Regions:
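Short, basic amphipathic alpha-helical segments that act as recognition/interaction helices
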Residues: 24-47, 78-101
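Intrinsically disordered, low-complexity basic tails/linkers immediately adjacent to helix-turn-helix/homeobox/MYB/SANT
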Residues: 50-68, 107, 111, 116-118
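Core beta-strand-centered patch of the WYL/Sm-like small regulatory domain
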Residues: 93-201
């Protein structure tokens, strides 16, 4: 088994390690994928410079090991280390969603084939097999990653699934069903991972809550209206739980009622955890 050991800049190493964590993929697998992806493509050239950098090492898989020497020689690059740095440099010079397309090329390709053939596909997502009608793949701007928007037969509802967490895709002979074309088009135009379109949440902030709202930008829902201290957001319940839960007592959920109940139940569970801790300490 051939071991790759190459010194790269701190910046290059940081992006590789970040992608490994973000996409839950070992560094070695990333290295094998990008070698195969770039073996027949032009590479950007990079100079390491007069500094030590970081050492990246992993093993080539059997298939890549068999083709590596021929590919390296044909590249015309003087050393293997330089060749690997060029591959990595070319890879990291893509935006994250483009790097995702490289790492999960097979999944993207199969989904695209399913959509083009207008057939349902089966996907393995979080260990479960789901039959879905795939409508489109869209990048979530806030996350810089791609989602498959589809109708899921298992949930009998529209769903967004992270492409990077789809483990496998299978084709079927069943035709795609478009139950509500207008809704699908509207979701495409107003896309967000939580499918907030047409869903609303009303809240009331304390003075401190307003200050937090103005500062906390990550996952902040779209503001539709603000009147008499009441804020109305375009927001799905899932997004509301993610965003507003961090405000604790500085926000009051007014609508919808099911969100209020869910948040109350979660807070009760949290209180119970701390009460149990206090009982143990007595």
């Amino acid at each position: 088994m051939k071991k790759v050991r190459v010194t790269i800049s701190d910046f290059m190493n940081e992006i590789i390690k970040s992608d490994s964590e973000y996409f839950k993929m070992p560094v070695g697998r990333i290295g094998n994928i990008i070698f195969k992806y770039y073996m027949d493509k032009n590479l950007n050239k990079v100079e390491l410079g007069n500094f030590s950098g970081e050492v990246l090492q992993f093993n080539l898989n059997k298939n890549n090991e068999e083709i590596f020497m021929d590919t390296f020689v044909r590249s015309g690059v003087e050393t293997e280390a330089e060749y690997w740095r060029n591959i990595i440099f070319t890879y990291i010079n893509n935006l994250r969603y483009k790097r995702e397309e490289i790492l999960f090329e097979k999944i993207f390709r199969k989904i695209k084939e399913g959509m083009e053939s207008k057939r349902k596909i089966k996907i393995k997502y979080h260990k479960y097999i789901r039959l879905v009608s795939p409508y489109f793949v869209k990048v979530a701007d806030d996350e810089n990653r791609s989602y498959l928007f589809c109708y899921c037969e298992k949930n009998n509802d529209y769903r967004n699934y992270r492409i990077s967490e789809i483990e496998e895709v299978w084709f079927t002979n069943e035709n795609i069903e478009k139950k509500d074309k207008k809704y699908i088009d509207d979701v495409y135009k107003n896309f967000d991972p939580f499918l907030s379109y047409k869903n609303t949440v009303k809240v009331e902030f304390t003075e401190k809550g307003v200050e937090l709202y103005e500062k906390v930008l990550t996952n902040r829902p779209k503001l539709l209206d603000k009147k008499d201290g009441i804020y109305t957001f375009e927001c799905d319940n899932k997004l509301a739980m993610v965003y507003f839960a961090q405000f604790f007592s500085n926000v009051k959920i007014l609508e919808p009622s099911e969100l209020k109940e869910r948040l109350k139940n979660e807070l009760k569970k949290t209180i119970k955890i701390y009460e149990n801790e206090e009982e143990k300490d007595v």
